[in-house]
Amino acid sequence: LAFEPAEEDLMKRQPRSKEDSLVNKRFLGRIILSGIVIGLTAFGFFNFLIQTNHELAYAQTATFTFMAIAQLMHIFNVRKQSGFGLDKSFFKNKPLIGALILSMGLQLSAVYLPFMNELLGTSPLQAGTWGIIFLAASLSTLVVMGLKKAFQLK
């Protein structure tokens, strides 16, 4: 995110007070809110998988993958102070795109490469599980975005 181009309305905003730290109460509130939403969703997802008779390693792998995907999607909540960060300006940040592709590649490696399965205790996921993971991650991202607006945690 360090390579993010400036937002168009940046100069219209009031400047931050020199006494304020970069991690102020509002920003800390967003971090805590996001952590709670993603954490509760992960807990619910794991519980759902266990209750539907999936093996422990499978449920752990799916939950681990959900958390990785949710964090990748959460980038779109933090790219901009207001609104959603998936717009045309996203494609101007090549390092961020590279980091997302690399992160997804590493996650796929952790899930599907046999030596990584052995090393990390993961197991390959079925295609349908990926659909549920992306749905849950998308919903948690939308919930965080909605709560951010509701509490005006810009």
Regions found by a protein language model. Name each.
Residues L1-K154:
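C-terminal transmembrane helices and immediately adjacent loops/tails
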